[in-house]
């Protein structure tokens, strides 16, 4: 079946609406929308909730851009795409909570299609979600990964382990030799067995994000915290910034295609700190993050 771009776009717009509505319901504050146009073609809706009770900053972005030539970041691992026009659309979000006991979360679902006259279109889906705790809780990690495993199950027994590994490998800071968080799912270049199956999987990932995240937020948002926890949260947020600016393909793609910089960098935490040579105290809750949660684990054995 030929790709149905309008069906994908309708799902993505609705997904953005639903995620914003549910995050607003948890926080009590509203998102502010910024509709924008891209000079080279296309545009989007950026929505940001700032200075909320639960969420210090949450950004949920929809974009649909098109152009006459694929950018270098997209053709580097797919050289056959050079010389094709393209359309790219997706929803991308990052939630930075206020309480250090609530983890940061990120999710993204996207669709690419590249075409040229006289040739079949090249298309694929990508996306996933991942969790970045500051203070780890076993039950939260298990719930997050169980939700991921269960949404993958209808698509095959090998889907969850494959996309979990891809997530573990992708969200890794090589210069720190350290995982960004506890992972989740990551997939890209998905175009088999057919459009409908791939689209259904992308929908399952998009719909599964809140099922994975909101129960964790509800469990942790009222835990008391102080300056020590806040300092560690801000320090660990530095890893988020490092990953996004140094390693993230989506950030590079957006900047190379002349994307909207404010929307691309919406994922950045509002406050962050670095500390030279930081080492957590032995046997502290901070040390437990490095010892028990950042190393790759099978959470749903």
From Swiss-Prot:
Record keyword Cytoplasm present: yes
Pathway: Porphyrin-containing compound metabolism; protoporphyrin-IX biosynthesis; protoporphyrinogen-IX from coproporphyrinogen-III (O2 route): step 1/1
Localization (cell): Cytoplasm
Domain of life from the UniProt record: Bacteria
Cofactor(s) the record lists: a divalent metal cation
Annotated positions binding a divalent metal cation: 96, 106, 145, 175
Enzyme Commission number, as recorded: 1.3.3.3
Annotated site residues (Important for dimerization) in this chain: 175
Residues reported in the UniProt entry to bind substrate: 92, 108-110, 258-260
MF term (GO), any: protein homodimerization activity
Statement: the UniProt record of this protein carries the keyword Heme: no
Main location: cytoplasm
Region annotation (Important for dimerization) ranges: 240-275
Cellular-component GO terms for this entry: cytoplasm
InterPro entries: Coprogen_oxidase_aer (IPR001260), Coprogen_oxidase_aer_sf (IPR036406), Coprogen_oxidase_CS (IPR018375)
GO biological process: protoporphyrinogen IX biosynthetic process
Active site per the UniProt annotation: 106 (proton donor)
Reactions this protein catalyses: coproporphyrinogen III + O2 + 2 H(+) = protoporphyrinogen IX + 2 CO2 + 2 H2O
Physiological role: Involved in the heme biosynthesis. Catalyzes the aerobic oxidative decarboxylation of propionate groups of rings A and B of coproporphyrinogen-III to yield the vinyl groups in protoporphyrinogen-IX.
Similarity comment text for this entry: Belongs to the aerobic coproporphyrinogen-III oxidase family.
Subunit relationships: Homodimer.
Protein name per Swiss-Prot or TrEMBL: Oxygen-dependent coproporphyrinogen-III oxidase
Organism field: Cronobacter sakazakii (strain ATCC BAA-894)
Gene: hemF
